[in-house]
Swiss-Prot record:
<dbReference type="GO" id="GO:0005737">
    <property type="term" value="C:cytoplasm"/>
</dbReference>
<keyword id="KW-0547">Nucleotide-binding</keyword>
<dbReference type="InterPro" id="IPR021130">
    <property type="entry name" value="PRib-ATP_PPHydrolase-like"/>
</dbReference>
<dbReference type="GO" id="GO:0005524">
    <property type="term" value="F:ATP binding"/>
</dbReference>
<keyword id="KW-0028">Amino-acid biosynthesis</keyword>
<comment type="pathway">
    <text>Amino-acid biosynthesis; L-histidine biosynthesis; L-histidine from 5-phospho-alpha-D-ribose 1-diphosphate: step 2/9.</text>
</comment>
<dbReference type="GO" id="GO:0004636">
    <property type="term" value="F:phosphoribosyl-ATP diphosphatase activity"/>
</dbReference>
<protein>
    <recommendedName>
        <fullName>Phosphoribosyl-ATP pyrophosphatase</fullName>
        <ecNumber>3.6.1.31</ecNumber>
    </recommendedName>
</protein>
<keyword id="KW-0378">Hydrolase</keyword>
<keyword id="KW-0067">ATP-binding</keyword>
<comment type="similarity">
    <text>Belongs to the PRA-PH family.</text>
</comment>
<keyword id="KW-0963">Cytoplasm</keyword>
<dbReference type="Pfam" id="PF01503">
    <property type="entry name" value="PRA-PH"/>
</dbReference>
<dbReference type="GO" id="GO:0000105">
    <property type="term" value="P:L-histidine biosynthetic process"/>
</dbReference>
<keyword id="KW-0368">Histidine biosynthesis</keyword>
<dbReference type="InterPro" id="IPR008179">
    <property type="entry name" value="HisE"/>
</dbReference>
Length: 106
């Protein structure tokens, strides 16, 4: 798996946040705040679900890319580096779902 593209997109998102432009979709989302970002993220998640139900491979890929992008926008807005997400996934890797859930409940 190649996470370089995710880091590259994340860097652009941070650049748009730091130096907003009227021409930037990302900057416009950031300017509208967390509620708009969350609304868009929810819409994209729903579109992934619909694409998954439809089963069309290309549609699933397209909509998942949108979901990843908008997730990165949320992370950028909240100053969370994707590396923190990767670290959490590494922590969970090899752990059963039941064991992972129990570790959260303590």
């Amino acid at each position: 798996m190649n996470d370089d593209i995710l880091q590259a997109v994340y860097r652009v998102i941070l650049e748009r946040k730091a130096n907003p432009s009227e021409q930037s979709y990302t900057a416009s989302l950031m300017a509208k705040g967390i509620d708009k970002i969350l609304k868009k993220l929810g819409e994209e998640a729903t579109e992934v679900v619909i694409a998954g139900k439809g089963g069309a491979r290309e549609e699933i890929i397209y909509e998942t890319a949108d979901l990843f992008f908008h997730t990165l926008v949320l992370l950028g807005y909240c100053d969370i580096n994707p590396d923190e997400i990767y670290d959490e996934l590494r922590r969970r890797f090899g752990m059963s779902g039941i064991a992972e859930k129990e570790s959260r409940d303590r």
